[in-house]
Amino acid sequence: MKLATYKDGSRDGQLIVVSRDLSSAHYASGIATRMQQVLDDWNFLSPQLEELSQTLNHGKARHAFAFDARMCMAPLPRAYQWADGSAFINHVELVRKARGAEVPESFYTDPLMYQGGSDDFLGPCDDIVDRKSVV
């Protein structure tokens, strides 16, 4: 099952189900309108979304439309927080070397995680706007 958030003029977008081959999609508004709703009530909503996904993938969804990735927002445009893990040792070694710092021995056995508060996230095809140049 593929879920996405489509631009609809709101800050949170509209939840859609996308076909396996990324050719078509269907609004999930009869089930949930926002991705956060799905995460908050996964056990109840995911089976319904899975059923819609199967219907879409079998070409039987009545109101399917052509999927356009440029219309996608970030899956969760406004998340409560985010977490990031540095799991790629090669990347960490290169970054540390560029800064002239050693990789701590504990990094090879203890995962490095950090979190931050969220503002908003950009979609995969959205422009990054330099706020200093906006008048």
Regions found by a protein language model. Give the residues of each.
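Active-site microenvironments in enzyme catalytic cores
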Residues: 1-8, 12, 17-21, 36-135
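Conserved "landmark" site that anchors the functional core of diverse proteins
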Residues: 25-29, 79
